[in-house]
């Protein structure tokens, strides 16, 4: 797992009003969680954005420097403004270098399937994350899955992924990561009313709403 260092300061005052004041000064309110306990802290916006640009794509093991001590942690959650997209709040989970933790890591598909290149198939994406359990230093930032060998009708499941020793997979092994299907034929011109089928429109996406500051 890639490592990152952030300098943090304790937050003596909390609340929405205080949080807004901090953000106006270029500081983001954050919280460090450990064993059910929480420590309000703050981090300079610029420094935190540099970390977040990587952490939202990779699972990062971060060192938080607080009061002369170093705490090892991972990104647990974050909130953004639903209108501006600006970062509002970040939660970290303090971890032990020797204790196993459960995290989800992103799946990255690489390669172009044979079934797509040669047979005009369509690559369908399944789950985008896999849950694993391991000590922090064993946790990869992401997992790459080569789909170039897939023909039409083939699929890659969680059980097909080979992790290094010391990593336990928690996700359902039968979950589909990717599959290649037959391309749907275009509808005939001027179909009869009985044959007309309205296409289904699937919209994905969810904007995080600001939670009440702790």
Curated annotation (Swiss-Prot):
GO annotation, biological process: translation
Biased composition (Basic and acidic residues): 200-214
Similarity annotation: Belongs to the bacterial ribosomal protein bL25 family. CTC subfamily.
Gene3D superfamilies named in the record: Ribosomal protein L25, beta domain, Ribosomal Protein L25, Chain P
KW Metal-binding (keyword) present: no
InterPro entries: Rbsml_bL25/Gln-tRNA_synth_N (IPR020056), Ribosomal_bL25/Gln-tRNA_synth (IPR011035), Ribosomal_bL25_b-dom (IPR020057), Ribosomal_bL25_C (IPR037121), Ribosomal_bL25_long (IPR001021), Ribosomal_L25_dom (IPR029751), Ribosomal_uL5_bac-type (IPR020930)
Quaternary structure and partners: Part of the 50S ribosomal subunit; part of the 5S rRNA/L5/L18/L25 subcomplex. Contacts the 5S rRNA. Binds to the 5S rRNA independently of L5 and L18.
PANTHER family from the UniProt entry: RIBOSOMAL PROTEIN L25/GLN-TRNA SYNTHETASE, ANTI-CODON-BINDING DOMAIN-CONTAINING PROTEIN, RIBOSOMAL PROTEIN L25_GLN-TRNA SYNTHETASE, ANTI-CODON-BINDING DOMAIN-CONTAINING PROTEIN
Gene Ontology cellular component list: cytosolic large ribosomal subunit
Highest taxon of source: Bacteria
Organism from which the protein derives: Thermodesulfovibrio yellowstonii (strain ATCC 51303 / DSM 11347 / YP87)
Protein name stated in the entry: Large ribosomal subunit protein bL25
Keywords recorded for this protein, A-Z: Ribonucleoprotein, Ribosomal protein, RNA-binding, rRNA-binding
Function: This is one of the proteins that binds to the 5S RNA in the ribosome where it forms part of the central protuberance.
GO MF: 5S rRNA binding; structural constituent of ribosome
Region ranges (Disordered): 187-214
């Amino acid at each position: 797992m890639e490592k990152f260092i952030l300098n943090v300061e304790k937050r003596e005052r909390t609340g929405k009003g205080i949080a807004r004041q901090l953000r106006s000064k270029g500081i983001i309110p954050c919280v460090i969680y450990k064993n059910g306990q929480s420590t309000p802290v703050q981090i300079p916006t610029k420094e935190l954005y540099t970390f977040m640009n990587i952490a939202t794509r990779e699972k990062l093991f971060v060192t938080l420097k607080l009061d002369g001590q170093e705490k090892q942690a991972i990104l647990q959650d974050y909130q953004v403004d639903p209108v501006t997209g600006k970062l509002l709040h970040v939660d970290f989970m303090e971890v032990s270098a020797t204790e196993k933790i459960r995290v989800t890591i992103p799946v990255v598909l690489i390669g172009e399937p044979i079934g797509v290149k040669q047979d005009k198939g369509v690559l369908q994406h399944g789950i985008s994350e896999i849950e694993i359990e391991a000590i922090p230093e064993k946790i990869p930032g992401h997992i790459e899955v080569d789909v170039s060998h897939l023909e039409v009708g083939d699929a890659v499941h969680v059980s097909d992924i080979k992790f290094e020793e010391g990593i336990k997979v928690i996700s359902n092994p039968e979950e589909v990561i990717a599959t290649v299907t037959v391309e749907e034929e275009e509808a005939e011109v001027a179909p009869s009313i009985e044959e007309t089928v309205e296409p289904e429109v699937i919209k994905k996406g969810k904007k995080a709403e600001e939670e009440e500051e702790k």
